[in-house]
Amino acid sequence: MKTYRRQIREKILQALYTIELRDTDIDSAAGWLLTQEILDDPNAMKFFNMLIGSIKAHMSEIDCYIERHTFNWDMSRIAIIDKNILRMALAEILYCEDIPPKVSINEAIEIAKKFSSTEKSSKFVNGILDAIFNELKTDGKIHKNGRGLIDHSTAKLHKNETSK
């Protein structure tokens, strides 16, 4: 049976949530949550390991982006679920070359609708991710390869402007 990336994202979110509440590391938390279906699917495990590895390796950088775009909000005041959805989506946007940023943002919004305790969470997640995405795009920090992954006309325009 094919494992869908949404299922993996949800498991990673649950692992991130667990480490916020318990004294454990992300690998242990994730290990408890993986189903046999995911473990048996090499593509699922590749995506899982890549995404969780990106989050682990770049958590402080990702958190800096979140902090810069959550005006008047201390990171400790952001709901744990929302904060971890933002972390996961930003890791995808920044480090998963084969996933279009809009897919990462849409997945984050849908996961927020499912897991967050308030309807406003999905709007909050959308607003923060959109602002960060626009900054990253303007700064030329999104490196995606392949058809449909990024608007290359905007990237070329930015490249031409910076080379002047």
From Swiss-Prot:
One of its GO terms (cellular component) is cytosol. It comes from the Bacteria. GO terms for molecular function: RNA binding. Keywords: RNA-binding, Transcription, Transcription antitermination, Transcription regulation. Pfam families: NusB (PF01029). GO terms for biological process: DNA-templated transcription termination; transcription antitermination. NCBIfam families: nusB. Involved in transcription antitermination. Required for transcription of ribosomal RNA (rRNA) genes. Binds specifically to the boxA antiterminator sequence of the ribosomal RNA (rrn) operons. Belongs to the NusB family. This is Transcription antitermination protein NusB.
